[in-house]
Amino acid sequence: MAARRMAQESLDSVLQEKSKRYGDSEAVGEALHLKAQDLLRTGSRARADVYEDIHGDSRYSASGSGVYSLDMGREGLRGDMFVGPSFRSSNQSVGEDSYLRKECGRDLEPAHTDSRDQSFGHRNLGHFPSQDWKLALRGSWEQDLGHSVSQESSWSQEYGFGPSLLGDLASSRRMEKESRDYDLDHPGEVDSVSRSSGQVLTRGRSLNIADQEGTLLGKGDTQGLLGAKGVGKLITLKSMTTKKIPVASRITSKPQGTNQIQKPTPSPDVTIGTSPVLDEIQFAALKIPLGLDLRTLGLPRRKMGFDAIDKADVFSRFGIEIIKWAGFHTIKDDLKFSQLFQTLFELETETCAKMLASFKCSLKPEHRDFCFFTIKFLKHSALKTPRVDNEFLNMLLDKGAVKTKNCFFEIIKPFDKSIMRLQDRLLKGVTPLLMACNAYELSVKMKTLTSPLDLAMALETTNSLCRKSLALLGQTFSLASSFRQEKILEAVGLQDIAPSPAYFPNFEDSTLFGREYIDHLKAWLMASGYPLQLKRAVPPESREQKTTAQTWASSTLSQAVPQRADHRVVDTIDQLVMRVIQGRLSPRERTLLLQDPAYWFLSDESSLEYKYYKLKLAESQRLNHSWPIVERRPTPAQCAVRAMLYAQAVRSLKRRLLPWQRRRLIRSQGPRGLKAKKATTAQQTSLSSGTRQKHHGRQASGSLRVKPPPRDSSDAAQDCLSEPAKPCPQPSSPGALGPSPRPTGADDSEALPASSRCPSANMDAKTMETAEKLARFVAQVGPEIEQFSIENSTDNPDLWFLHDQSSSAFKFYREKVLELCPSISFQSTGEAGDSVQSPTAGKEGKGEPQEGHPEQEASLEGTEVLPEEEEEDEEESEDEGGEETSTLRPQAGAAKCPGSEGSSPTDSIPGEGSREDQASTPGLSQASSGSCFPRKRISSKSLKVGMIPAPKRVCLIQESKVHEPVRIAYDRPRGRPIAKKKKPKDMEFSQQKLTDKNVGFQMLQKMGWKEGHGLGSLGKGIREPVSVGALSEGEGLGADGPEQKEDTFDVFRQRMMQMYRHKRASK
């Protein structure tokens, strides 16, 4: 009661003195009507009530009724204190001011703006003389310095402010700690009590008002307030200052908040709610505490109730620490905070204008994205936009709550999508504020703010960061408003057709749309006549039925296209449909698309874009199924690998089937011919048909790609003849000992349709491209290349047309050769010295290549040829120049018979009847006439051991009529040839890599490069070696230029050139 009575007496004396000096003041006249109950109620009022009083004041109303009566004095003060144009218009109503349309000449300094409104309120400031204002401003600026920094440390010594400005802070704080008593000899260290509720003011809290009142009343008047009674009370209450540090409320915008204390102190001591931890600071060494000691910091339980909170609760401790760190517990009694708050939107500043614009105006998308994209996401993994846990979704699926994850997202999408965008923007909006606070803390700890210049730069940086946060947070607020506007317009059915609210920002009041937009919307509704109809919630059953009906309609009515799909999304939808149709969209990529913002329509089945996507996909699928199905051909690399695998499989199969015993062979007089055996036609061709089926079936239809297992002859013959490019079926039974006899005319009549059906009627693009390449190669080198291509294209399915000269592809190839080189002349196919052909074969094989597949040649060999012979035959066909061929030429020439020309090769053996000879002739001719078994014409260059035709062989021993075929036993060298040619190693350059013996490899290692790392200074270059066959085209080492795709024909062309050079060198 003594403290309350002293406060009332002090306040009455101050008001009486002020009424004498400012008798004409309207504000002071209002202040003289203070009542005791108002003063008592001020101490216990909640902060929210005070703010309600502030907002309820006429100055903040939009009607414009509250106009300052003290602005003339304020304009005079501006002329004394601030340089620059006036930012205050003649009409002082906030509701009628447009901050966007004002021209702000320059930015006011924060110190000037904050110091305009002082603790006496707006009404009292207007009547101060300029000199009194300067004195009050000085006290406020001193308190501002102390308030903004000295929560953890005092800046007075860091910035070198002398005792003339701030007083001896260190000595006064040290005296307070040691003696715990007030020394009246130092006027700056005496506090007085002003709250009617009995709370005590700290020394720093009463600095500003006491300094100002001391200036107004004079030293003698103020000293009268500090009588013996008051001093005794102060000394008694001194023990409370270490724990209780609340300050009386100084909200001075209304008369009830004018609690003022007088204290004549020329050297103030600036503090803010110091705790015992802060009292331990030694200002000579300037130790910076990292936080407040919550255990010793006691606050009134009736206000915040910290003591009632369980200290063992982690979240309670976090809450208290955050409140103390941010200083929320000091706002209620913080005079400076109240002054700064009252200044907002009262004095015109560009900061307030831009803040209003950013919160109420939605920027254009490109400008908004520019602002947000300049701020990067925080590095901490927890400070990201939260996503729904995948484990939670899996739990829903396991429990059967939802069928798919998309079903769950469809349910939460109406609100979750908008909230995620708000969270994303909030994280970026607070990032600059975090940077400012963090920079201040680091500066204090590292003691970098040691001069006024450093302080000015730090303030400028902080101001810039705060502006960025204001703009970003304002656009986040505007985004939330836009979401609400869209949802409301969607509910009444006006979202897509009504004018956009973004063009009508509301700066007048807090309504969502604003009066201007509502008037415009009313006019638009009257002009358009569009009815307003509130949408009703659709039951789940009807929604599912509607979705099913829409899906059915999209699959049946291909021409129905939505009318209002966003044109910006149409291109994305078209690209997605093409990827789905072409099969280039994997399930993993499709899952990732659901999280891509560009493909948002995949998760919104009710959107027009999704409907357009479904209809477009159904239409594309329908058109795709109506087209002829063209299967994709294998790549050249796949063809090469499969050909190699097929050749290995055939070789291993022959090794298993052929016996290991050497047979004596019969030497024949015929110079050339096909090797034959007595086995049946099906047995002769079973191996060859299986192999040929793999290659030729793939080139004909592209569907037979799996290597079949070894089968019997009937299955092999049926499969061979079932292919579309094969000759007509043979009526003879393939399982018999020999083919059934038929007349030659029948053979001719069936061979002609076969030859007409064998050529591929539909020549695909790959075959055409291969034919063009080969034609250019042959025209460039010569016709000999064609012969070598025919002999060595067994394992290359892309050159199938060389063995079927009646095909359209071969004709196209010959036309291209003649077109590129008109003077070229090909060797005649009917030369007497190079071919052995029967009349029937002459009809069937007219125009066919001179040499067929070595694979067929292997198939026509006897089943008892030695593996060594088989391997050497294959090596000769691949290497084209082995010693075997050159040594066999003279033997074949010596064995040549003059009457060998014109005779047809058969499967008969001397001693057998003529019926078997005649019967086997058409069977073998027909088997070799089709594309499955193309005819082979034997020349002296490819004649090998055991290939002398059967009718020209000389019978040296008596043979039974039924026996196995025999071979001629030549005296062959036991050892391997000295100059045996191997397969060129440089053909495998695609699999070769540099080793540590390579000079370039060693150079790179010396330069610091390691295997597996990229080239370049930062290791961002290529990791794999550059292909040997790729041309650099001027690029430097390690340049990742366009890779040249090498197909099978390129490899084949290189092999042909090397073998051709080797062939000519061996002649």
Swiss-Prot record:
Residues that bear Phosphoserine: S93, S206, S267, S586, S740, S838
InterPro entries in UniProt: G_patch_dom, SUGP1/2, Surp, SWAP/Surp_sf
Compartment(s) where it occurs, according to its Swiss-Prot or TrEMBL record: Nucleus
Motif (Nuclear localization signal): 980-985
Covalent cross-link Glycyl lysine isopeptide (Lys-Gly) (interchain with G-Cter in SUMO2) as placed by the record, residue numbers: K219
Superkingdom as given in the UniProt entry: Eukaryota
SURP motif repeat coordinates: 573-616, 770-813
All residue ranges annotated as the G-patch domain in the record: 996-1042
Region (Disordered): 177-199, 668-767, 825-944, 967-991
Segments of skewed composition (Polar residues): 680-691, 825-840, 919-931
GO molecular function, one term: RNA binding
Residue ranges with Basic residues bias: 975-984
Coiled coil feature spans: none
One Pfam family of this chain: G-patch
GO CC annotations, alphabetized: nuclear body
Function (record text): May play a role in mRNA splicing.
PANTHER family: ARGININE/SERINE RICH SPLICING FACTOR SF4/14, SURP AND G-PATCH DOMAIN-CONTAINING PROTEIN 2
The protein, known as: SURP and G-patch domain-containing protein 2
